[in-house]
Amino acid sequence: MNNVSMRELLEAGAHFGHRTRFWNPKMSEYIFGSRNKIHIINLEKTLPMLSDVTNYVSRLAANKAKILFVGTKRAAQDSIREHAKRCGMPYVDHRWLGGMLTNYKTVRQSIFRLKELKEMKEKGLFNDMIKKEALMLTRELEKLERSLGGIENMGGLPDALFVVDVGFEHIAVEEARRLRIPVIGVVDTNNSPDNIDYVIPGNDDSMRAVDIYVRCVADAILDGKNSNTVGRVSSDSEFVEVTSNSNEEEKSGE
């Protein structure tokens, strides 16, 4: 099994929170302490909570549920896109459009337009148009692809949301809560875990750490689809000394 250990999370800098002056007191139960004015996240809490998430998404996937991956900040975009595609789930990696969930009927019309333009391009119809018209339609297609390409085949509202950085993606979280769609969220020390059904306390700015969370969720979804046993997160609570690295320096530059 491709387990995730405490050491792997530490090496990825998953334990580095934000500067202490930016903290959200509601995250206090997940904070181990501080170093150089940066909060240290207690990974002994992160590991079992990540395990709870993988078990949950595996059960959802086994029942053919749709889980929408959301991560539009630079540290998350590539991982969200790569792993969502790998496990066959919809995703938003560019910019969350207001009403993407709460006004899905309108969004669906844009998705129909996206499919229409893609079909026209595949059939070579753009080549038969005057240059200006073809250019306008190409730009429209690119814009729709960037905004809606990841949810093109979602086919309706998702059964759950998986969000990297619940503060940055607060509009997505609010829309999901309004529609009573469960939210799984990576929550750093500067954000609130309130209204997040499944919390993953962890660094949401480290690309390596984010990739671990997203990979674990995608692997669990694939396991669920294949009806395999979930065991992605190691329960081995080996002692590993917390050391400073580039992630701490990155956080301190806020």
From Swiss-Prot:
PROSITE patterns: RIBOSOMAL_S2_1, RIBOSOMAL_S2_2. GO terms for cellular component: cytosolic small ribosomal subunit. The gene is rpsB. This is Small ribosomal subunit protein uS2. CDD domains: RPS2. GO terms for biological process: translation. GO terms for molecular function: structural constituent of ribosome. Keywords: Ribonucleoprotein, Ribosomal protein. HAMAP family: Ribosomal_uS2_B. InterPro entries: Ribosomal_uS2 (IPR001865), Ribosomal_uS2_bac/mit/plastid (IPR005706), Ribosomal_uS2_CS (IPR018130), Ribosomal_uS2_flav_dom_sf (IPR023591). Belongs to the universal ribosomal protein uS2 family. Gene3D superfamilies: Glucose-6-phosphate isomerase like protein, domain 1, Helix hairpin bin. It comes from Legionella pneumophila subsp. pneumophila (strain Philadelphia 1 / ATCC 33152 / DSM 7513).
